Swiss-Prot record:
GO molecular function: metal ion binding; transketolase activity
Its job: Catalyzes the reversible transfer of a two-carbon ketol group from sedoheptulose-7-phosphate to glyceraldehyde-3-phosphate, producing xylulose-5-phosphate and ribose-5-phosphate. Catalyzes the transfer of a two-carbon ketol group from a ketose donor to an aldose acceptor, via a covalent intermediate with the cofactor thiamine pyrophosphate.
NCBIfam families: tktlase_bact (TIGR00232)
Pfam families in UniProt: Transket_pyr (PF02779), Transketolase_C_1 (PF22613), Transketolase_N (PF00456)
Name of protein: Transketolase
Source species: Haemophilus influenzae (strain ATCC 51907 / DSM 11121 / KW20 / Rd)
Residues that, per the record, bind thiamine diphosphate: 66, 114-116, 156, 185, 261, 439
Family (UniProt): Belongs to the transketolase family.
Assembly mode: Homodimer.
Keyword terms: Calcium, Magnesium, Metal-binding, Thiamine pyrophosphate, Transferase
Amino acid sequence: MATRRQLANAIRVLAMDSVQKAKSGHPGAPMGMADIAEVLWRDFLKHNPTNPKWADRDRFVLSNGHGSMLIYSLLHLTGYDLSIEDLKQFRQLHSKTPGHPEYGYAPGVETTTGPLGQGITNAVGMAIAEKTLAGQFNREGHEIVDHHTYVFLGDGCLMEGISHEACSLAGTLGLGKLIAFYDDNNISIDGHVDGWFSDDTAERFEAYGWQVIRNVDGHDAEQIRAATILAQAEKGKPTLIICKTIIGFGSPNKSGSHDSHGAPLGDEEIDLTRKALGWEYAPFEIPAEYYAEWSAKEKGAAAEKSWEEKFAAYAKAYPELAAEFKRRVSGELPTNWAAESKAFIEKLQANPASIASRKASQNAIEAYAHVLPEFLGGSADLASSNLTLWSGSKPIRAHENVGGNYINYGVREFGMSAIMNGIALHGGFIPYGATFLMFYEYAHNAVRMAALMKQRTLFVYTHDSIGLGEDGPTHQPVEQTASLRLIPNLETWRPCDQVESAIAWQQAVERQDGPSALIFTRQNLAQMDRTSAQLDAVKRGAYVLKDCDGTPELIFIATGSEVELAVQAAEALSAEGKKVRVVSMPSTNRFDKQDAAYRESVLPAAVTKRVAIEAGIADFWYKYVGFNGRVIGMNSFGESAPADQLFKLFGFTVENVVAKAKEIL
């Protein structure tokens, strides 16, 4: 029988061999954390390699994602559908083993990590989802949701500011099933961290309200095992296990040095490491008895079978809850969703109201949340401004409302966004969270990660332009909406009234292959008249809102608060005998995906005289109006003044729009 160290060495050699074959990568972290991984994955982790999506599996997150060969080795050794050939294709085009772990490639990878700090933050989201789902579905004697979230993280994750945001909230919420292993090796890319990272990490996490287990030898299996048992016993606090490790463990000349962090060890050093570890096998060769010791298939199948028996008893006692649980974790929407959302939208169109689109957003949440118990909302300390609360909101607290549906994220925009990604990845919820559009900047990378992972995360942004007024340019977005539109696989919506707002929410909920950004105003917006055909066309991203007889001479394209301005300018020009079309374009991303025939029907190529109007950066719009068109937008930062004065100052008036249009008519 192989020893624990020998089993851990299987990880080490796979890591160094794969990195060497790829001619790039990070062998140091996998080699340093191999002993911790061996104990966790063989003694504690509840998972089933033959069903990586089992609902009650433990979640494992490698926050220090550059050490990706650690998780790939673990998945391969324990029996997931990840072959030795897949490991040989590490970092190669279209392989299942990209340079950083990517969700959707190798089975068993729970989230895409690499941008440091976001993995631990995703894990906080997963732990929140587990605790909340348990609160909503578990009943006495029937704990169908009962799993841990484990995280590996390093110095880099802890230096990133997002780790403070996430770990502070995790402590406040008492996430007792969140257990983090800190790879305390004192090394980062530039060398020994003493010169730039001298925090007392244990004191820091104790201040957050975590249980901290200090001074664990990360190469002593019994110490690691004892610490993990202690962590599992603490039900009311998350746990940080501080493991003292040696980066590149086993390498005679590069262990304990940044030389092993981010580059292949080299053939000569690998030979020396094999000798030092007593590893007599060829590259990528693992003895059959080692595979047998590592395999989690039998144990995992038994664990899932035991859970299925529990769930059968639960379904017998609570058939409706059981059916709802299965629906929720599958990601399917309720059977009445389509009819209810359609009826709500039609009701809004039939009952005009001139309200701020942020208020329209709240009304949509109110209507849809009654149909969608999977909504898990929140705001970064701006609920009264973002209007994200509804009549049934139940804020989650450490010991109250553990089955609630709303998270007070505090002033943590980046943390909130990455936590929502973790909630979405866990399953069972559709998370939405809000802040001012200007402060999306803090969270940009988490929004990008949601798009990369194709998660149904709903980002809500209010106070969308100079229209917020007196707070001034620090709070007035200019380039932010355009920036969001440029993120691949993110759909951005900027609706013009309560109807488009409700449709934007509807489309975001129904979209299962990526996130959406919903952008709303502070100021009131007039409701537009629409036919049933126009109402149905809103979801296509752009549609003809007002038209003329025959071929138009000019097309106005507008979004959000500027649609009314476009309509008024069109009316003024029409009174002078001009043929003008107004296109409302709430989602450029959605419109760009439409077939060529539809796009031509909205923006005919023959009509080259076009004017775009949006209180955002002007440059974005030339793709729609052409170089000979006109854009009425922002080319500078805003000012501190009442909103009506600012719109006049920056040219958002009927007179200026008409004048610009006449330049090309």
